[in-house]
UniProtKB/Swiss-Prot annotation:
Stretches assigned to the HTH asnC-type domain: 12-73
Organism: Klebsiella pneumoniae
Top-level taxon of origin: Bacteria
Any one of the GO BP annotations: response to L-leucine
Subunit (UniProt): Homodimer.
Keyword Transcription regulation: yes
Protein name: Leucine-responsive regulatory protein
DNA-binding region (UniProt annotation): 31-50
Amino acid sequence: MVDSKKRPGKDLDRIDRNILNELQKDGRISNVELSKRVGLSPTPCLERVRRLERQGFIQGYTALLNPHYLDASLLVFVEITLNRGAPDVFEQFNSAVQKLEEIQECHLVSGDFDYLLKTRVPDMSAYRKLLGETLLRLPGVNDTRTYVVMEEVKQSNRLVIKTR
């Protein structure tokens, strides 16, 4: 986690921000094309990309896959409430959930429950199995609430990067 007081993004200039915006749009863009779009020659552009990678602004590159083509059509969000009787229940839960490939995201949140999970499964029977055989058996789980997504209205991994 980055210390919010240091705010490393403040040191990015307009070109760095443009590079990040272009890479968010297309992570497979060639360095030559990227350099044209941000107004640099290829060598300094590549040097900036490598620096942004070293500094942690760019954490990696991935392919966006179509879940409907890959037997993962059902998107489900799950609220998890833990039994807070055990002193290390949060650490145990965190460790256990890291091992579950079916869980795409897990967030510790404030409010009436402790965690919000995002999972994708083939269908409702697969989710029922995941819930009954896995999620309810995670360390400290006291209660769950399930929200089945009926329609994905918007999905994006892009961050808003102001170019100043």
